[in-house]
């Protein structure tokens, strides 16, 4: 899985330097973080709706498709912020073996 994420991260980085009319991702970067976040919000809602539909229909194709869009746009957001997908994988790895309640209790309150 990390090979796919690494390849995608490389492409996303390349698109930062591309002309806005050369690709969808380049156009998102050109429009700025707010547009990327707007798109991420849209994809979140679409994923939720697809999951609700899948729960009753037992057809999971749309929820898989929408989840891929959500992950993709999350990676675009991280890239726009100068972060690599490996940071998320590292955080998930850190959480293995840690109770969700313990992890939440260990967080520092934000100021």
UniProtKB/Swiss-Prot annotation:
Instruction: List the taxonomic lineage.
Output: Bacteria, Pseudomonadati, Pseudomonadota, Gammaproteobacteria, Pseudomonadales
Looking up InterPro entries in the UniProt record yields: HisE, PRib-ATP_PPHydrolase-like
- Main location group: cytoplasm
Q: Which family does it belong to?
A: Belongs to the PRA-PH family.
Which UniProt keyword terms apply here? Amino-acid biosynthesis, ATP-binding, Cytoplasm, Histidine biosynthesis, Hydrolase, Nucleotide-binding
Task: Report the superkingdom from the record.
Answer: Bacteria
An example of a Pfam family matching this protein is PRA-PH
Record's protein name: Phosphoribosyl-ATP pyrophosphatase
Entry keyword annotation includes Cytoplasm: yes
Q: What is its EC number?
A: 3.6.1.31
From the Swiss-Prot or TrEMBL record, state where the protein is found. Answer: Cytoplasm
Enzyme's top EC category: hydrolase
Annotated GO biological processes are:
L-histidine biosynthetic process
Q: Which reaction does it catalyse?
A: 1-(5-phospho-beta-D-ribosyl)-ATP + H2O = 1-(5-phospho-beta-D-ribosyl)-5'-AMP + diphosphate + H(+)
- Which PANTHER family does the record cross-reference, listed alphabetically? HISTIDINE BIOSYNTHESIS BIFUNCTIONAL PROTEIN, HISTIDINE BIOSYNTHESIS BIFUNCTIONAL PROTEIN HISIE
| GO terms of molecular function | ATP binding; phosphoribosyl-ATP diphosphatase activity
């Amino acid at each position: 899985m990390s090979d796919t994420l690494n390849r995608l991260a490389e492409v996303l980085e390349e698109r930062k330097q591309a002309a806005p009319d050369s690709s969808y991702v380049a156009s998102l970067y050109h429009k700025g973080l707010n547009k990327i976040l707007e798109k991420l919000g849209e994809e979140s809602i679409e994923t939720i709706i697809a999951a609700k539909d899948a729960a009753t229909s037992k057809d999971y194709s749309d929820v898989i498709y929408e989840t891929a869009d959500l992950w993709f746009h999350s990676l675009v957001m991280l890239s726009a912020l100068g972060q690599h997908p490996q940071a998320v994988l590292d955080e998930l790895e850190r959480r293995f073996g840690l109770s969700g309640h313990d992890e939440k209790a260990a967080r520092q309150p934000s100021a």
